[in-house]
Amino acid sequence: MKTGLTVLIAGGGIGGLTLGVALRRAGIAFKIFERAPALLRVGAGISMQSNAMLAFRTLGVDTAVAAAGQEIQGGAILNPRGEEISSMPVSKASAEVGAPMITIHRGRLQDVLHQIVGDDNLVLGAKVEGFRDGPDGLFVRLADGREFQGDLLVGADGLRSAVRAQLLKEPSPRYSGYTSWRGVCDVSEGVRRDYTSESWGPGMRFGVVPIGEGQTYWFATATAPEGGVDHPDARTELLQRFSGWHAPIPQLIENTPSSAIMRTDIHDRVPIRQWVQGRAVLLGDAAHPMTPNMGQGGCQAVEDAVVLARCLSLEAELPAALARYQAVRVERANDFVAGSYRIGQIGQWENAFACWVREKLMRMMSSDRVDARTRRNLQFTPL
């Protein structure tokens, strides 16, 4: 179905750019509309787990992604004193599925994908506001009034997707009950280069993730009402919140300017099973926004992109291609939405006794074996 097909993509994030790479490899014409005026190295870190790296391998970009990031060999969940509660056999899992886990700055990953997509296929400063799909064709409308015609619209425009809003009449995103802070700093002392950790305390968590080039990405969560606002000095507030927690947590916060600390309330949406309507389809966070607790949000967007491009290449008719994409992807992606939500609720327990029980159970369940579910999560087959 390559001949004459033009795909319009709303959103130039990881999912939209990966779809652009996949379509370019497949010889399918496309145009990406990104609301930002430039693709800058903004944001924080992201985990490309083995399943995403296997998906990238089908596009021939896994080596470039790995070179721009940091390969991870292991990880653990700790308590606020720094004692290990549960270990994660990352290197064993990577060996079993045949691909590494790579952590990387979002901006560097974006650069790798952008270089392949090319500037000619990217329209910047272009916010998609809506579309019309009628007898005269499919037209995408931008906020500045411009219109573009194509054969398929892919909504890869995130949690608050304009494409999804037009397809579905539904409530606002679901608040998880906790907020987050994220930062990137150059501190490497006390941070293992190939090891990630997440420390769990009552109602709070703190993650430490090396992302290459001497940088460390960190994130923090705290149970809080939706819509809270930080004190102007976010760094001081976080140092107070995590006072007494083990190194290098205080050092990471201390070495990140308040202006570089991003606060975001954590949301997802109740999973849905219909991502397709006419000549419009959803991808990534627009289709299945999830909390970040399994590190799979970006990974699932990458999987979506590879599968959608493959379906468009293999099927003779557009409706059949979109139906196949939805059938392949919905259940797997929605499983991650549900699993991530459950982990977040457990991770944010505040009751002291409940946290004590949680720690005891996690110690008992910790294993250096790769269980069947983890193995399944980290595998990827395009179709």
From Swiss-Prot:
Gene that this sequence comes from: auaG
Assigned EC number: 1.14.13.222
Function: Catalyzes the initial step in the conversion of aurachin C to aurachin B. Catalyzes the epoxidation of the C(2)-C(3) double bond of aurachin C, which is followed by a semipinacol rearrangement, causing migration of the farnesyl group from C(3) to C(4). Accepts both NADH and NADPH, but has a preference for NADH.
Top-rank lineage group of the source organism: Bacteria
The name this protein goes by in its record: Aurachin C monooxygenase/isomerase
Top-level EC class as recorded in UniProt: oxidoreductase
A molecular-function term among this protein's GO annotations: FAD binding
Phenotype of the disrupted gene, per the record: Mutant accumulates aurachin D and aurachin C and does not produce aurachin B and aurachin A.
Sequence positions that bind FAD: G15, S47, V128, D285, G295, Q296, G297, G298, C299
Keywords from the UniProt entry: FAD, Flavoprotein, Monooxygenase, NAD, NADP, Oxidoreductase
Catalytic activity: aurachin C + NADH + O2 + H(+) = 4-hydroxy-2-methyl-3-oxo-4-[(2E,6E)-farnesyl]-3,4-dihydroquinoline 1-oxide + NAD(+) + H2O; aurachin C + NADPH + O2 + H(+) = 4-hydroxy-2-methyl-3-oxo-4-[(2E,6E)-farnesyl]-3,4-dihydroquinoline 1-oxide + NADP(+) + H2O; aurachin C + NADH + O2 + H(+) = aurachin C epoxide + NAD(+) + H2O; aurachin C + NADPH + O2 + H(+) = aurachin C epoxide + NADP(+) + H2O
Swiss-Prot/TrEMBL cofactor(s): FAD
